[in-house]
Amino acid sequence: MLGSAPAMNVSSITNNPVWAILFWVSFYSWFFVFETWVSMRDVRAKTTIDNTDGYSALFFWAMLYTGIFLAFAFAFLAPAFRIDSDSLNSLLFTSGIILIWVGILFRLWSIQTLGKYFRTVVLIQDDHKLITSGPYRYLRHPSYTGSMISVLGVGLALGNWMGLLFILSTVCIGYRWRIHVEEIALKKRFGSAYTAYAEKTWNLILFVW
């Protein structure tokens, strides 16, 4: 029965079927609907490319799936790490749902700004240009920032500190390698222009990295 909301039994606040529906709609909208659309853009693209991905996409997805699995496992199977305070859990849950959608919109903005140059694998196109407008004015990899915001939202909404730690840690490891590979490819393509651009921008998080 929907009223029992067993799948979201991570705290008292998430036993509410309205909260359960809100979480699952948000999670599926991000992880399955939106990210499937992002992947389909690559399938439709027909551009001569220099693929320098080096399996970084595969590594990232492996880390993301691992993080999501651990986050849900801790949320459902490790009550010792659950947030017992209803008021705090309510705040974190609400913040988490908001962040999932903020991340989706920020990633969408980044993808639309990059246009045809956005791909889910690291590659250089024949007519590749350095985009420095929109979110790329301040961040070199803002689409990843959007994903991180959504990941943070999922972790907060699940209401388990250990799950939050693991999902953030694994995704950070995945993006750390991905960005390393991508930076090498972009520096090779754009040379000093990219070096100058990198000196006045951040990788993923403003004022942090």
Give the residues covered by each predicted segment.
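Membrane-anchoring alpha-helices and their flanking helix-loop junctions
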Residues: 1-125, 152-209
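Active-site-proximal inter-transmembrane loops
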Residues: 121-147
